């Protein structure tokens, strides 16, 4: 079939458009399909059609459902929540998952992604931009047409897990920078960063762990028994990759605990250094006070005849000593 040439086709080619459709064949060729031509886009053998919906209108969704006769049970699944789930009906199945990404350094956000697939056609749906889906819109991959809908969904979900691996890499870099700071002179400022990284790792685990139900169900032999061993192999590999991602998230939480132990040890070492200095100062001043007390300081020094001026001068000197000691302590990170 030919791609549409009207205004809708122009919208379909944009990487930021709400509607995007591409038809792949086994020869490694692909073509963009407009929304108006979607009804005529009925994939045959060794072809695969993919529709990507980014924050579409209800009219766009209804048009896709009507053109491809997608199961009605999957329609309310699109905006039905954020909890990862999977379902199927006859020739189609659908899955909801959460992509890691976005937010700021204090909080990582997730984007809900829904895939509806079957009969050599795949629909992906999200309300926000997802980087790897935007890349897939412009890429011209090889013989994607030979893949079934199940294998294409496995590819999408594998990229979804890649977003968690990327987030874990960023977390590990933050841990390394923090530990370098702790071993340097920034230990006093590390506690807030430790708290942030702990919350960040816990949030990432809460986002990833519920996917166990999805990947566990998809890896069972009875999930898509009519699609052959290839789909089973892809889903099993996907479940193994999920378990690896979950282990790495758990390890990220342990890394925060290890950094906290390093922080505690460094704090204890600095406290010991400060106590050694304070002990030395106490011994010296105590010895001086003992000598002064023994002599009674009964000398006819002019200071004792200076009256109020001498008194206030001594007070000013004591205040200056206190401020100097405070400045020294802050500079040495004693408190």
Predicted regions and their residues:
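Hydrophobic alpha-helical transmembrane segments and their immediately adjacent juxtamembrane loops
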Residues: 69, 240-335
């Amino acid at each position: 079939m030919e791609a549409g040439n009207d205004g809708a086709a122009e919208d379909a080619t944009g990487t930021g458009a709400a509607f995007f459709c591409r038809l792949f064949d086994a020869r490694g060729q692909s073509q963009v399909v407009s929304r108006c031509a979607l009804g005529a886009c009925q994939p045959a053998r060794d072809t695969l059609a993919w529709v990507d919906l980014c924050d579409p209108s209800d009219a766009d969704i209804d048009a896709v459902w009507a053109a491809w006769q997608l199961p009605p049970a999957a329609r309310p699944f699109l905006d039905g929540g954020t909890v990862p789930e999977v379902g199927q009906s006859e020739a189609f199945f659908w899955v909801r998952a959460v992509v890691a990404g976005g937010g700021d350094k204090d909080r990582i956000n997730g984007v809900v992604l829904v895939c509806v697939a079957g009969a050599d056609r795949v629909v992906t749906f999200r309300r926000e931009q997802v980087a790897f889906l935007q890349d897939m819109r412009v890429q011209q991959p090889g013989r994607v047409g030979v893949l079934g809908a199940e294998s294409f969904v496995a590819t999408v979900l594998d990229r979804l897990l890649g977003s968690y691996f990327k987030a874990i890499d960023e977390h590990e870099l933050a841990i390394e920078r923090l530990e370098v700071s702790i071993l340097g002179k920034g230990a006093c400022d590390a506690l807030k960063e430790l708290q942030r990284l702990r919350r960040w790792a816990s949030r990432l685990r809460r986002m990833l762990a519920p996917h166990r139900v999805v990947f566990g169900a998809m890896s069972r032999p009875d999930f898509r028994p009519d699609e052959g061993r290839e789909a089973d192999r892809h889903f099993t590999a996907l479940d193994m990759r999920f378990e690896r991602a979950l282990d790495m998230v758990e390890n990220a939480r342990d890394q925060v605990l290890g950094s906290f132990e390093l922080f505690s040890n460094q704090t204890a070492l600095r406290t010991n250094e400060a106590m050694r200095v304070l002990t030395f100062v106490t011994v010296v001043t105590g010895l001086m006070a003992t000598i002064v007390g023994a002599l009674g300081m009964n000398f006819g020094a002019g200071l004792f005849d200076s009256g109020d001026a001498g008194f206030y001068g001594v007070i000013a000197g004591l205040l200056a000593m206190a401020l100097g000691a405070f400045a020294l302590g802050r500079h040495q990170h004693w408190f």
